[in-house]
């Protein structure tokens, strides 16, 4: 039986300030918004009318609708244990990235080594449209804050944006070699970091652009802070910069002994944006105050386990931080390392609380909203759920025949969507016992 999830909306949020572009002047100004919902037509006209308010519509989930019979591009079963509900199999090479539409969590976009990106439906794996035109591996993909736009970026620096409802391309740009890409949390504004050290910011689909020039080395990771006014960017030389998106200048710069001693690999912020966590190939995670720009804590695993299955060609002595994040309900942070260590740190005491070992390197971790459960995916192709309070493994999900390269978690934590070197993306239905 097949059914489709109906769209819905987030709860009311107070009016927010506006980020604006002014042509070639590279000036961003903050404008107070009048109460009431914005006119969508205004967003597509003047740059000063960019709206940061979240859409206010009702959202309704769908708890059924899984299709068990194979369709074109959907694998219903495979040899060995497979806990997944749906497998998307239209990619012909490794699938590098996945993102879910934030408004309804009913659509996914995936990008791969086959130079292709697809937008498809989670409930049955049905292809909605292909994001065509890339000429290199698609390593970044994501939906805008209101799920109306989807962006894809390839390694060569070609970025494209499509209107989801019309399935039409509305914008494209060729930057330098792409390192990361992220939508602004409240506006149709796209940010990206490139190998030349620049961080780019575009109004979509107008295309008005602003650049933030970093050191003469790749901008390896970045994240817009929750207030939408600042962004933190990490660089290959170990430098961390917190940028003011209004002024176009760095508020804080951490470098030398203040920064990392190796390239930045990942960055995360807590819910209110007061704290930033950065990870590096130097095996350290640094806790930084977003207000003062000072390092307030440094985390490193107490013991470094032997590194089983870190991958062919990897240097065994390297134990980089691969992923990290903050718990939303407790003062905890999780750090995942290449050697397979998941470290849970207590932020209030800045001590290691639990150390959970995987059999192979961790690729990514995500916290479940509203709980102390952290999800990990690793090079052994398994998704694991951990209770950060006890360090206990709750359950795992299997089905891939190669390493997992990325994963996404639905807002209600009912679905996990993974991508893998086995050329497939999978949807897992998560059982949620009382936490």
From Swiss-Prot:
Main location: membrane
GO cellular component, one term: cell surface
Biological role: Plays a role in angiogenesis and cell migration. In smooth muscle cell migration, may act through the RhoA pathway.
Compositionally biased spans, kind Acidic residues: 39-63
InterPro entries per record: WD40/YVTN_repeat-like_dom_sf, WD40_repeat_CS, WD40_repeat_dom_sf, WD40_rpt, WD_repeat_multifunction
Keyword check for Cell membrane: yes
Database matches in CDD domains: WD40
Chain segments carrying region Disordered: 1-65
Positions of modified residues (Phosphoserine): 20
MF (Gene Ontology): heparin binding
Organism this protein belongs to: Canis lupus familiaris
Stored SUPFAM superfamilies: WD40 repeat-like
Keywords linked to the UniProt accession: Angiogenesis, Cell membrane, Cytoplasm, Developmental protein, Differentiation, Membrane, Phosphoprotein, Repeat, WD repeat
WD repeat coordinates: 90-130, 133-172, 174-213, 215-255, 259-300, 316-355, 357-396, 399-434
GO biological process: angiogenesis; cell differentiation; positive regulation of endothelial cell migration; smooth muscle cell migration
Cellular compartment(s): Cell membrane; Cytoplasm
Name of this protein: Angio-associated migratory cell protein
